[in-house]
Amino acid sequence: MRIFWQSFVDEEASAPYLARLSAYLSGIAAPGVTVDVRGLSPSDRDFGRLAEFRCSMRAISNGIYAERDGYDGFVLGHFQDSGLYELRSALTIPVVGVGESTLFAAAQLGRRLGLVTLDPTFEILHYEQADRYGLGGRITHVKGLSFIPQDFSAAFEGDAEAKARLLRRFAECAEPMVASGADVIVPAGVLPGLLVASERAYRIGYAPVVNCASVALKSVEMWMQLRALDGIEPSRGPSFALAPERAKADFQATLAPTKPSARRQTP
């Protein structure tokens, strides 16, 4: 089975991150599962609502192409899940958002969730996201690291000091959350999620830290397996009515007619 993993970072500027992510997903994927990791250019480089909207349009377009190219599942690898519902209504293959899958998983581990996100700009977006998923009462803290994707490059290239520095900053954001009642910590982004992936059983005080990269991959694998077993798919009523082919063609016509190029494939 083949999974298309859509990141919102630039494939050249964040090459160390995408290479590490691809290798990590390859190492934990179920037998017979291949994950293709793709970025975007221009990436989500000017954080804010307009950039989220622009990147979501490209992600939706890539998702439509991915299904036509025979992929079995799609992961929206951007924690804010911009375009998730639109993708789910455009595709018949399983579509998983890193944010949605991780928040629901974290909600099983504790009552009060603290989110550590990449930048303070995203803080309000995560509160809105939690409300959208019916988890608004469970998200008690959100704090931005004030980083950009390239700040992680040295750590993902093997610089131990850079990794330790990033982990210290992550802990600085998370520790006050735990002190004031959060009992689960969520890295609200695959960049910090991948950073903590090598820290087995990582905790801030008593609070487990949820690795969103592994949660998203195992979630899409589960839904692909359930679709094969039971034929289950999203509701095609009001929530995720399937877009007709003309609607998809009209959408694609609004964007440059270029298919995503293959960059990284994990066997």
Residue ranges and their predicted role:
Residues 98-103, 118-122, 212-217:
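Short, acidic/turn-prone active-site loops that include or flank metal/cofactor-
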Residues 183-204, 208-212:
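A C-terminal functional module that forms or caps the active site or interfaces directly
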Residues 31, 90-93, 109, 135, ...:
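Short, structured coil segments at secondary-structure junctions
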Residues 1-54, 119-160, 251-252, 256-267:
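N-terminal glycine-rich anion-binding loop in soluble enzyme alpha/beta folds
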